[in-house]
């Protein structure tokens, strides 16, 4: 196509490369094209501004011209030679985009822009480490094509946005990790000459609810959203910041042309779908999406939609499809009436976190604040569903004007719910609290509320005093109670009861038995100490022998004999015992212990030498 076929009022192409690596590309609004520019290593910031200083009549003429809407990118670049080209940079900037990369959807519906407003439509691509290649970026920016489905035409990413946000224009953020795109099966086959990124989203036509639009002019919709996404703590807070935006008037050039509006708005794809391969997704992820429709249920009405599950060929759940409905269709237009514009609806998304097996956050579902969204969006006649590939990050304020969206959020790993465990006092989980712990921490009493812990503590204190006043030991009390009550009332039980190192139920069981026995022992003590000993019983007949202590001289003699012979005979042991004036059994045991000590020491040295 020659350059003279272009409209005379085309705006010049301005390429500005700033210090931050951003480029500003301007092109006419009626040319439905996308200019993509990227570096070798990183994605630079692209700002595509639409020069709206066009008359409505000129826009209508260019919209009716079939050749004007289907012109290629090379023709646009040649047309810019007539106008001034401004480059503010110390380095050269080269734009290399082949003709097949840019896909144009022919539209017979004219789009007239109000000449009174200057509308800029920037697309900011945030740079991230090791980002997309030139071919991948061009493919992502030009659109998506469904494999073997009714979407037989390439779809342009809709870029038209009303007005400016905060004086900088509405932002449509595209941030994608680079390295993972090449690892996905079916996505690496894009030819360098300009193949499209083909994402097989079959059955997306079921997600649209289309209504015919009257040929007269629609009321202008004014909307802006400036969500503040600063930190992870603020993800659960939603807020709406509304401002006045420029009005865009859309009309049909021919009354016979049926223009459709998409009520469910566009399609927002979570970028985690791109990095699904690196996070453990199955290779059949893409093929499963092709063979299995994403949306299986009929959508006669937007309200009442439920989430859908996306599974691979093995039946494993790899993603969910939460369909976000407009609250205005359920609870009325009360929220929308508070906004300055009539055609606005408010959508609230509750944030959810997706964690991998290592506990790292890999994606968020619906982490955007409350958004003021236009209720209708125009759709090109040949495009069934407009697709918008976006990603919202928490690095800064990002504004996105989009209708109610369908979010595809794959789940490479199981979502781990975060639970908080509260420990009552110093009581560890899985352990029964003792009486002492419960008395010191009254708030920890649960099932023991019916037990008077203070009474048990006072009784344990008095029981010890009364036992000592009778001259009885814990062993004597335990022996007497074991003979009459059973082994549960041994000396160790008496010791733990006096120290309150016992559970409330056990203490409640011991208390009446100890109280009855102590009262009876005091009665026997009044009759005489001898009667008390008869009642209690003598000390256990089996006593532990007194530990033998060797003098340093005896130890030296024993070590000397041990160095000569570590295993003496019985006669030698008897002679050594007579010499040292010790019992023969004591000397024999010493030699046994000394040999065992040497054996254990030798084992330790062997391990240390290794």
Curated annotation (Swiss-Prot):
Transcription factor that binds with high affinity to the motif 5'-TAATGARAT-3'. Residues 55-87 are annotated as: Disordered. Pfam families: Homeodomain, Pou. PROSITE patterns: HOMEOBOX_2, POU_1, POU_2, POU_3. This is POU domain, class 6, transcription factor 1. Its main location: nucleus. PANTHER family: POU DOMAIN, POU DOMAIN, CLASS 6, TRANSCRIPTION FACTOR 1. CDD domains: homeodomain. It comes from the Eukaryota. It is found in: Nucleus. The keyword Kinase does not apply. Ubiquitously expressed during embryogenesis. GO terms for cellular component: nucleus. Residues 448-522 form the POU-specific domain. GO terms for biological process: atrioventricular canal morphogenesis; regulation of transcription by RNA polymerase II. Belongs to the POU transcription factor family. Class-6 subfamily. The gene is pou6f1. Keywords: DNA-binding, Homeobox, Nucleus, Transcription, Transcription regulation. It comes from Danio rerio (Zebrafish). SUPFAM superfamilies: Homeodomain-like, lambda repressor-like DNA-binding domains. InterPro entries: HD (IPR001356), Homeodomain-like_sf (IPR009057), Lambda_DNA-bd_dom_sf (IPR010982), POU (IPR013847), POU_dom (IPR000327), POU_domain_TF (IPR050255). Residues 543-602 bind DNA. One of its GO terms (molecular function) is RNA polymerase II cis-regulatory region sequence-specific DNA binding.
